[in-house]
């Protein structure tokens, strides 16, 4: 790429220069830019694969590893340092619609409960986000949740419902959490327990939800669809330079993370416009390889649809 920088009339930018910019420029600037871009992309929402129309989100967090010797402020324990990225991923367009950055040592719930999901939405998350008081708050706000039931959870079965064993459903029960801890935290009066056998994994799963309208098989399928948020974390870590950082301070690290999220947002929008069925990971790799090429995004993402220009007569020999 060095020759192309030369032909552009651009000089090589020193790593120290970029690091200084990341140190001095407030991370909140890039956070606001991400939020503004997100508003522009509201009309680009697609649809998730389920029949219901409710917005579906996956809530999850992932550690972004840092150097303990360079980032002492991010210390988790004596041999690890990290910052935690929490997202609420919209399943309709695989865009992180809700984002929070916190210390790696924090419990997942610290940032998780700060995300304000819209009324009527469905949120799916793992057992790291079990908080009975939060469950009650979501129920009051008309937000449905789907999660795993923790082992040894104390509950009382209030009613049992018919199940379709052919779809892997072993039990569909309405339950009341009866432990002292659940009562103290103000858990919802009634919840739904679904027992599901996964043929592929040969495992039985127990799900907990406050949604009493969807089919039990749909509840199980919603939790299985949570893998999309894991693909999101994999994509940004592998393709958007979140393994090495320019700068050591909290501000510099957060700045680079927000820039990576902005890049992911732009590529996701380009993916929606291209409508080629390509993954965000593939589009990111194409952009990296062609970063200094004189091509439009349309030409990169839909090369077969761009007509080949005929040679000009002036540049041809008459034979």
Question: Model-found features: residue ranges?
Answer:
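DNA-recognition alpha helix
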Residues: 1-8
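Single, function-defining residue in the core of a domain
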Residues: 8, 22-25, 29-36, 48-55, ...
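Pyridoxal 5′-phosphate
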Residues: 13
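Primarily marks folded extracellular/lumenal domains of secretory and cell-surface proteins
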Residues: 38-45
């Amino acid at each position: 790429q060095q020759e192309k920088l030369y032909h552009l009339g651009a000089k090589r930018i020193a790593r120290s220069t970029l690091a200084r910019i990341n140190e001095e420029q407030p991370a909140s600037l890039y956070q606001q830019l991400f939020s503004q871009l997100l508003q522009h992309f509201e009309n680009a929402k697609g649809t998730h694969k389920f029949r219901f129309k409710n917005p579906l989100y996956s809530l999850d967090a992932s550690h972004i590893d840092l150097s303990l010797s360079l980032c002492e402020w991010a210390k988790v324990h004596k041999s690890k340092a990290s910052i935690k990225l929490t997202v609420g991923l919209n399943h309709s367009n695989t865009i992180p619609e809700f984002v929070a950055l916190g210390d790696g040592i924090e419990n997942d719930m610290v940032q998780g409960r700060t995300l304000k999901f819209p009324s009527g939405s469905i949120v799916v998350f793992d057992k790291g986000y079990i908080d009975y008081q939060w469950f009650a708050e979501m129920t009051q706000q008309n937000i449905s949740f789907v999660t795993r039931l923790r082992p040894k959870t104390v509950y009382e079965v209030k009613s049992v419902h018919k199940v379709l064993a052919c779809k892997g459903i072993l039990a569909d029960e309405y339950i009341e959490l009866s432990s002292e801890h659940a009562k103290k935290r103000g858990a919802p009066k009634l919840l739904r327990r679904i027992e599901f056998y996964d043929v592929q994994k040969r495992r039985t799963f127990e799900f907990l939800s406050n949604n009493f309208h969807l089919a039990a098989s749909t509840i199980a399928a919603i939790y299985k669809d949570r893998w999309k948020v894991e693909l999101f974390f994999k994509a940004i870590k592998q393709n958007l330079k979140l393994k090495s950082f320019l700068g050591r301070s909290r501000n510099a690290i957060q700045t680079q993370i927000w820039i990576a999220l902005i890049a992911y947002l732009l590529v996701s929008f380009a993916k929606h416009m291209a409508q080629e069925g390509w993954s965000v990971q593939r589009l990111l790799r194409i952009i990296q390889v062609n970063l200094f090429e004189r091509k439009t995004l349309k030409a990169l993402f839909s090369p077969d649809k761009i007509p080949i220009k005929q040679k000009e007569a002036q540049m041809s020999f008459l034979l």
